Amino acid sequence: MQYSEIMIRYGELSTKGKNRMRFINKLRNNISDVLSIYTQVKVTADRDRAHAYLNGADYTAVAESLKQVFGIQNFSPVYKVEKSVEVLKSSVQEIMRDIYKEGMTFKISSKRSDHNFELDSRELNQTLGGAVFEAIPNVQVQMKSPDINLQVEIREEAAYLSYETIRGAGGLPVGTSGKGMLMLSGGIDSPVAGYLALKRGVDIEAVHFASPPYTSPGALKKAQDLTRKLTKFGGNIQFIEVPFTEIQEEIKAKAPEAYLMTLTRRFMMRITDRIREVRNGLVIINGESLGQVASQTLESMKAINAVTNTPIIRPVVTMDKLEIIDIAQEIDTFDISIQPFEDCCTIFAPDRPKTNPKIKNAEQYEARMDVEGLVERAVAGIMITEITPQAEKDEVDDLIDNLL
């Protein structure tokens, strides 16, 4: 027998009340986008569940793609069969012969939305259970936590059988919580922060600061590759490259070394916030983890945050490095993150950065610079590229390959 569809059950959508259908429609669109590479697959959704009709597509590949979609609690591969007692009996026997191993227990769980069907749920459980005993005489029934729970659903158009439930990614459908700008450096932490924001339904755009010739084309490609890894969880992502060389040279020339990192981060925050305004984002997201480096003390965060009133989401702020690495390995970004390309935060990093910078001091040093002009020129020079989940190269890839 061949699977005909995948039955998809929702996660936290059950708590969304009057907005439930908006969340469901967004989830349906997200599922359709992720499964668009399987041209045969068709997706529908109603208030209770969604269905991915395989139409001959490879179930295993489709299931792997579904595991990445946020908003799905779990899903089950389903056999569609004729709605008759005899066909149901023979189908149940065929499935059980295929999956049963010595010593396993089972139960039949039937329900029907077609109340004109000749047997009610209790009678159907008994009839199909009897068919299983005919096929496998020594099998044992167990009503609580059996090894095999064979689920039978009688609908108007057909009968559906399933026995396996696969855990989904959970969370909320990407896009239901608004848009956020992810400050993507190229390290381990910021891609994990982006992943966790996606899981809570935030549609992210990646903002990456490049300082050529101090940062290499390889560093830019690394950030782009990390962005591509995140697309499998939320679809296409806009990659925004910000020219940052002029600003870093200005900071280096006009500020004391201890404040280089603080001022660099304040400029990054200003620029990201300006991009957010233009692109209708609601929040800024970054990979700061409390106390991990000098710019991530509470005093530093306060001094850096002072340049904006926009909410800053720090998904990994309370995690230690090993916890973050575990997630990075799970989402397949770790090996890219540890590639030996320096980002613009490390090239001018002072030997002894200030861990408790004062806002008034930062403002005093910035008064030596044309802050607004520097920010405006950086924002005017951004380059935006749409990063897709597919393996084919984007325009930025081609450009970088020519430079390397």
UniProtKB/Swiss-Prot annotation:
Gene Ontology molecular function terms on file: ATP binding; CCA tRNA nucleotidyltransferase activity; tRNA binding; tRNA-uracil-4 sulfurtransferase activity
Residues that coordinate or bind ATP: M183, L184, H208, F209, R265, G287, Q296
Protein location: Cytoplasm
Main enzyme class: transferase
Reaction it catalyzes: [ThiI sulfur-carrier protein]-S-sulfanyl-L-cysteine + a uridine in tRNA + 2 reduced [2Fe-2S]-[ferredoxin] + ATP + H(+) = [ThiI sulfur-carrier protein]-L-cysteine + a 4-thiouridine in tRNA + 2 oxidized [2Fe-2S]-[ferredoxin] + AMP + diphosphate; [ThiS sulfur-carrier protein]-C-terminal Gly-Gly-AMP + S-sulfanyl-L-cysteinyl-[cysteine desulfurase] + AH2 = [ThiS sulfur-carrier protein]-C-terminal-Gly-aminoethanethioate + L-cysteinyl-[cysteine desulfurase] + A + AMP + 2 H(+)
EC number per UniProt: 2.8.1.4
Pfam families membership: ThiI, ThiI_fer, THUMP
Entry keyword ATP-binding: yes
GO cellular component, one term: cytosol
Similarity comment: family membership: Belongs to the ThiI family.
Function in brief: Catalyzes the ATP-dependent transfer of a sulfur to tRNA to produce 4-thiouridine in position 8 of tRNAs, which functions as a near-UV photosensor. Also catalyzes the transfer of sulfur to the sulfur carrier protein ThiS, forming ThiS-thiocarboxylate. This is a step in the synthesis of thiazole, in the thiamine biosynthesis pathway. The sulfur is donated as persulfide by IscS.
Protein name: Probable tRNA sulfurtransferase
Name of encoding gene: thiI
